[in-house]
Amino acid sequence: YTSLIALLDSDTEDYTACCVLVDKEEIGSVGATGAASVFFENTVAELLVKSGDTNYLSRIKALENSYALSSDVNAALDPLFKEVASKNNVARFNYGIVFEKYTGARGKSGASDANPEYIAILRNAFDDGNIHFQTGELGKVDLGGGGTIAYLLAKYNMSVIDAGVPVL
């Protein structure tokens, strides 16, 4: 919901923006409405065709030159279960949106790792806009962790990072 509202309230027209809503993350992002489907890729191809561009490489380059925030929640410091978090790397309430450079579970399984150049772009944009943000991770290896769809977007060489609010 917050991603859609942010898009609708946006006043920039310099770049094409979209909000892709998917489900089925808990079962592997499969199915026609999951992030592993080709819905997003096909939609980009259809938009290019509508604009008169039928070159296959254009779709690849459009996806590759895109930036994405994979909106999801992040684990906040839970005072009842402090042992599952790294106290220096855990998100806290009221410190702003959380950027997760690295997500995944069981070490590197199903992980995504945002590139530092994209993180720098985001930090500069948020600093310039005086918007509070923080970095965090989901928890200690094999104690915390969780799924992400960021890797499904990163497969297009897209710059992507998990971003969202901290919750218990």
Q: Which ranges hold each PLM region?
A:
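Flexible, glycine/charged-enriched surface loops at secondary-structure junctions
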Residues: 13-19, 53-65, 126-140
